[in-house]
């Protein structure tokens, strides 16, 4: 496990594995992205990123071991979530920012009392996942991370339907900053 405390932040960022053999990633690339996101999102929590480099799938999950500002955030990422879309098996900083940023926001949400009822990431329904992704992606966009609103709108429509009412609900999630779990409307 590579253990790094980055300059300008007190957050301890660790990455597993230390050395990648199936994908062309450097641990430092992941540390840099997580450190940058920590600054953008105002998160100083220690973060542990575990990358499954044996699959090109893009599944992500995040967990947190408490509700304090020093609670450990653990992110599990299949390597496809961090790949450069133009050069698969190579690190893509933009894709990593979007993927890891969504998981960091989920972890930050989970530290709030109004997210206490949220299921673990791997237990979320497709609708719950789509709603939370829309909420996180909108916040990332406002923080300065380039996000494709249309991509997340389409993902949301695929789970909730194609209608003006569904689009209005997506717009509400995309523009929101302080929703609780039950406000996401995907129960």
Go through each PLM region and give its residues.
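Auxiliary, metal-adjacent structural segments of Zn-dependent hydrolase domains
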Residues: 2-80, 138-139, 143-145
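Short pre-active-site segment immediately N-terminal to the catalytic Zn-binding motif
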Residues: 81-99
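N-terminal, positively charged nucleic-acid-binding surface of large information/translation enzymes
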Residues: 88, 117-118
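Active-site recognition of the HExxH zinc-binding catalytic motif
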Residues: 94-115
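Hydrophobic/aromatic-lined pockets within catalytic cores
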Residues: 109-113, 140-145, 178
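Post-HExxH zinc-binding segment in Zn-dependent metallohydrolases
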Residues: 120-155
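Pan-zinc metallopeptidase signature
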Residues: 159-187
């Amino acid at each position: 496990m590579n253990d790094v405390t980055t300059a300008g932040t007190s957050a301890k960022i660790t990455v597993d594995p230390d050395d990648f053999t199936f994908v062309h990633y450097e641990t430092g690339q992941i540390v840099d992205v997580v450190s940058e996101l920590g600054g953008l999102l105002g998160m100083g929590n220690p973060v542990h990123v575990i990358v499954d480099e044996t699959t090109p799938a893009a599944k992500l999950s995040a967990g947190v071991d408490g509700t304090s500002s020093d609670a450990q955030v653990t992110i599990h990422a299949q390597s496809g979530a961090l790949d450069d879309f133009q050069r698969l098996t190579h690190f893509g900083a933009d894709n990593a920012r979007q993927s890891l940023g969504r998981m960091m926001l989920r972890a930050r949400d989970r530290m709030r009392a109004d997210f206490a009822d949220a299921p673990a990431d791997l237990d979320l329904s497709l609708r719950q996942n789509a709603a939370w992704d829309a909420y996180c992606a909108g916040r990332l966009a406002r923080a300065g991370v380039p996000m494709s609103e249309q991509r997340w709108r389409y993902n949301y429509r695929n789970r909730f339907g194609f209608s003006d009412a569904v689009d209005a609900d997506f717009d509400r999630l995309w523009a929101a900053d302080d929703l609780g779990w039950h406000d996401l409307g995907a129960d």
